[in-house]
Swiss-Prot record:
Homodimer. This is N5-carboxyaminoimidazole ribonucleotide synthase. Belongs to the PurK/PurT family. Its EC number is 6.3.4.18. The gene is purK.
Amino acid sequence: MSFNKLKFGATIGIIGGGQLGKMMAQSAQKMGYKVVVLDPSEDCPCRYVAHEFIQAKYDDEKALNQLGQKCDVITYEFENISAQQLKLLCEKYNIPQGYQAIQLLQDRLTEKETLKSAGTKVVPFISVKESTDIDKAIETLGYPFIVKTRFGGYDGKGQVLINNEKDLQEGFKLIETSECVAEKYLNIKKEVSLTVTRGNNNQITFFPLQENEHRNQILFKTIVPARIDKTAEAKEQVNKIIQSIHFIGTFTVEFFIDSNNQLYVNEIAPRPHNSGHYSIEACDYSQFDTHILAVTGQSLPNSIELLKPAVMMNLLGKDLDLLENEFNEHPEWHLHIYGKSERKDSRKMGHMTVLTNDVNQTEQDMYAKFEGSN
């Protein structure tokens, strides 16, 4: 796909004013673009860095058209906008990311089927539409397995682990509320992710392979480069995905590595991703920089240089008191506080990145600081 390059001073619209929208806006502004953001929250983080703010729900057709009329290009920071609404916008306005990826990825079953058809390695799964399908899941997958809702859910929401017959009731409860997908539970050795930007004329730029750790289904930390030799294999899997899903901009593919060292595609995030935040300080281009380059039709860098290894830590509400006490003693901490008005213990309130020559030691230091609050 090829489209005209946006000139400096043009206006970029962002659907979604959370931290991802804020960091997109900051990258856009340093490149000379104006930013208009649409978000239902009057005090969303992006509002305070955007040139203009439209407060409206994501399904407000009048407001979305207002955004389109004000902007030369539109992008979005998350995948929870209506795919049908996005399709209608794409017919009238310049939205390089398109709607196709959103349409596929909002449905976990369609996502799994698309990944499998693309030739990537995915965890065995089956569709679960009603409670009687659980018997088929037990027969096909065996214990343990995970039941996930087909639609919605993030940071571990909308899923239950079925270890044995005693857990089946929780699975039945979930199926009563939504159609689901059942997946074989893996004995996971490591989680990694690969952030990629696809630009004008199908130019592809890869970031370093990222090693991730989750706590309570929320990303806890990312280490770059990943301490496992899976980069070539991950790139091979991503290239298969790129051939199957239309998308322009930055996206991330999450992988599981099991106890047999097998790499499985877990899911795709069709936008900049939490595990790529380290790139703001640790790389010559951040994931937000390359996203803006892509959606404005600019050329991408041929490769991304990792300037220094890094450890990125998510900061939840419960971490902020500790952070305030420690921050002045650690000038090596690159701190990002998102500006969310409501603080909750398990809500992502910011992140910090530490550039280091010894990621193992830095990881231990971070554990010593934050282990007690997690």
